[in-house]
């Protein structure tokens, strides 16, 4: 008899974004001419930077030339890209990260799930609430949780609320946890963490022998110079943290696929036999076995991000989306919405009006305004009564969406 991984049966309904798509498609089936504007899923809309396109075009020519053709590349990524990442994203900010500690991949989403391959099932796990659903769902799939309760919380997980009631600060848990997921700038709330706040987490992790999974996919949107871009800016973080980054949002690589994970070589855990085990070695083994690397063409495009032209072009992209976020904040606040985030992050977190549930507000915006956002409850129980609006869209669409919403709620 064939057995399935029955942990999948514990997953609550559909993954958040497919459920949004189901509702939108149902509405469009009845209203095929509705001018839908999507400010929900965090997908970019603006073209790839010219520097990246030109580098990829040249790489395509390389693939057509026997002398420059590339077959299988290093599973960890080409050295020339890893060296650029180390120099520009870490060493330039005072972080002692070596190129060999960087693993290039096809997405931070994939890596935050795949990293569980090198950890056992008996770890205690902490996530913020609300939270990027992938952190929770991948742990459910891997058998690290119990069943979900009526609020959607899974047994075996420690939930750390980040809401307006605590100024969106992730409080250190009173109990000991082994694996900690942190994402700053935060998805979905748009909240940021100060150096002092992150240092407290690093100190907690070192004291308790914990590992922090730090998702910095949105660090490029930080404009406040006092805020850390990497957890490795904090003292001791190399001893307790793995960081995930992506080219998806800063360089528009959502459809091109390139990211990277940093696993410091001095990061160790103790095996059941008392032996200290290097996590870098485990992750390197995992990637070498299960991953064939990102394509040469895409990696050349990612390398171009670090050129002088590339840096200028991605700054233009980031500024564009941040201005969209500023417009969303300003327009919604003008008609009385309580609005958070959207300053050092591309997401605006909105309190739903008149006591509406997150999904009721979703339906109201869809039906009355033909605008799609993301229900806060889809990110966890503490997200109920909130709504995420993404700045990733054209200026024209953002302005039109705000016009529709402010007209409906003024």
From Swiss-Prot:
Gene3D superfamilies: Aspartate Aminotransferase, domain 1, Type I PLP-dependent aspartate aminotransferase-like (Major domain). It catalyses: (2S,6S)-2,6-diaminopimelate + 2-oxoglutarate = (S)-2,3,4,5-tetrahydrodipicolinate + L-glutamate + H2O + H(+). Its cofactor is pyridoxal 5'-phosphate. The keyword Cell cycle does not apply. Its EC number is 2.6.1.83. The keyword Glycoprotein does not apply. One of its GO terms (biological process) is lysine biosynthetic process via diaminopimelate, diaminopimelate-aminotransferase pathway. It is an enzyme of class 2 (transferase). Keywords: Aminotransferase, Pyridoxal phosphate, Transferase. One of its GO terms (molecular function) is pyridoxal phosphate binding. Pathway: Amino-acid biosynthesis; L-lysine biosynthesis via DAP pathway; LL-2,6-diaminopimelate from (S)-tetrahydrodipicolinate (aminotransferase route): step 1/1. The modification N6-(pyridoxal phosphate)lysine is found at residue 249. InterPro entries: Aminotransferase_I/II_large, DapL/ALD1, PyrdxlP-dep_Trfase, PyrdxlP-dep_Trfase_major, PyrdxlP-dep_Trfase_small. Substrate binds at residues 15, 42, 109, 132, 187, 292, 388. Pyridoxal 5'-phosphate binds at residues 72, 108-109, 132, 187, 218, 246-248, 257, 292. Homodimer. Belongs to the class-I pyridoxal-phosphate-dependent aminotransferase family. LL-diaminopimelate aminotransferase subfamily. Involved in the synthesis of meso-diaminopimelate (m-DAP or DL-DAP), required for both lysine and peptidoglycan biosynthesis. Catalyzes the direct conversion of tetrahydrodipicolinate to LL-diaminopimelate. This is LL-diaminopimelate aminotransferase. The gene is dapL.
């Amino acid at each position: 008899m064939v057995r399935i991984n029955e942990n999948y049966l514990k997953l609550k309904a559909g993954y958040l974004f497919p459920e949004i798509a189901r509702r939108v498609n149902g509405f469009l089936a009845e209203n095929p001419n509705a001018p839908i504007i999507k400010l929900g899923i965090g997908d970019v809309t603006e073209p790839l930077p010219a520097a990246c396109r030109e580098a990829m075009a040249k790489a395509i020519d390389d693939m057509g030339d026997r002398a420059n053709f590339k077959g299988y590349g290093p599973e960890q990524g080409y050295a020339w890209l890893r060296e650029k990442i180390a120099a520009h994203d870490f060493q330039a900010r005072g972080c002692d990260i070596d190129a060999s500690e960087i693993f290039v991949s096809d997405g931070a989403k994939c890596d935050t799930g795949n990293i569980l391959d090198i950890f056992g099932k008996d770890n205690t796990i902490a996530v913020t609430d609300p939270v990027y659903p992938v952190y929770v769902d991948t742990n459910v799939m891997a058998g690290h949780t119990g069943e979900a309760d009526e609020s959607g919380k899974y047994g075996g997980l420690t939930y750390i609320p980040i809401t307006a009631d605590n100024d969106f600060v992730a409080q250190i848990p009173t109990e000991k946890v082994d694996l900690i997921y942190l994402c700053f700038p935060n998805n979905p709330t748009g909240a940021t963490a100060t150096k002092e706040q992150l240092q407290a987490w690093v100190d907690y992790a070192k004291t308790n022998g914990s590992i922090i999974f730090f998702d910095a996919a949105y660090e490029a949107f930080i404009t406040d110079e006092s805020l850390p871009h990497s957890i490795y800016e904090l003292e001791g973080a190399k001893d307790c943290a793995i960081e995930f980054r992506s080219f998806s949002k800063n360089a528009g690589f959502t459809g091109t696929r390139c990211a990277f994970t940093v696993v410091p070589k001095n990061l160790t855990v103790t095996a059941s036999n008392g032996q200290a085990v290097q996590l870098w070695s485990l992750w390197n083994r995992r990637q070498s076995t299960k991953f064939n690397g990102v394509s040469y063409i895409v990696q050349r495009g990612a390398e171009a991000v670090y050129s002088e032209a590339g840096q200028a072009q991605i700054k233009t992209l980031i500024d564009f989306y941040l201005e969209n976020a500023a417009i969303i904040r300003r327009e919604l606040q003008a008609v009385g919405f309580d609005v958070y985030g959207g300053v050092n992050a591309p997401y605006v977190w909105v309190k739903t009006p008149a006591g509406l549930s997150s999904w009721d507000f979703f339906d109201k915006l869809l039906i009355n305004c033909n605008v799609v956002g993301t229900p806060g409850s889809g990110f966890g129980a503490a997200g109920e009564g909130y709504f995420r609006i993404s700045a990733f869209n054209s200026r024209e669409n953002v302005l039109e969406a705000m016009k529709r919403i402010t007209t409906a709620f003024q």
